[in-house]
Amino acid sequence: MSPRTTRTAALLVVGVLTLTAGCAGGPALDEKPSVGIAMPTTKQLRWVADGDNLSEQFGSLGFDVSMQYADDDADAQVQQIEEMVDQGVDALVIGAVDASALTAVLSSAREAGVSVVSYDRLIVGGADVDYYASFDNRRVGTMQANSLLEGVGVLDATGEPTGAKGPFAIELFAGSPDDNNAHVFFEGAMAVLAPYLESGVLVVPSGQTTFEKVATPGWSPETAAARMATLLGPYRAGTRLAGVLSPNDGIAQAVLPATADLGYLPVVTGQDAEIPAVQSVARGEQHSTVYKDTRQLAEVTVQMVRSLLTGAEPEVNDTSSYDNGAGVVPTFLLSPQLVTKDNYRAVLVDSGYYTAEEIG
């Protein structure tokens, strides 16, 4: 255990009874533990919620919190992390802009005795990542693919084949190449879609089916909208666009307007349950989204950090799936949930994630 971790562990053991999830009471510590939170962007609403949840939960447990957003600039995020280490934070929670760009700065953090938790996006290429907290990202992809198949009529509402032979024309989108999760989402989706593509039930008129061809740098909605516009030729000529595999809500909400002049709505998937997308789902426009309760993810992350700083072993439920190139990173995975027009109120409003007024 490093000198900094030893110091922090001693402080936290003194106040361990006060550091329970959801409890901010009890005597104050003489010296607060500190955490640096490095988030990738404010352009996606979900990351704003992530930052707010983390800051609130760490703060309620007596942590000094330093939080920075990098505005999708990998170099800026490296600088922000360097500054946090120089400030003397005891731990870092990082949602990476570029999963492979942090090796050097995290090596410096390790030398300074700083614990590191990779948050939602797996940091790759370096050994200086202690733990990973995320959702079952492959399952996200399979959910999106099955929702697409249900929406176009290949599967029924129970997930059973309808016998429809197609061919159903679809187009594929993936997330940013520098986000490890984007690859996992796409792999999960394609594992489901591949048999239907091979049998001809599904077809991709553009021919763009590899991750490299369908990736969206920076998860940019503008880039996705521009690409969708270039793909519309066959559909304006009479081929019906049955559906679009979209990896998140930002891209889904860019794709839908781009297809507006077709005169009908293709089935479009999403992820993150952002309010504009949920409103679109409620109106019957976007077909589905995948809900990931970032309150739970923040709670898991906070408990990981607390365990690390007190010398305890964080709880994990996956010790084999997430190899970042330097070794397997111990992981806690949460379960995502599909949201549709039929269940959005039960899933999102009844759980308290949103109010009825927010969704409208």
Protein language model regions, located:
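A residue-level marker of the well-folded mature domains of exported/periplasmic proteins
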Residues: 3-4, 23-360
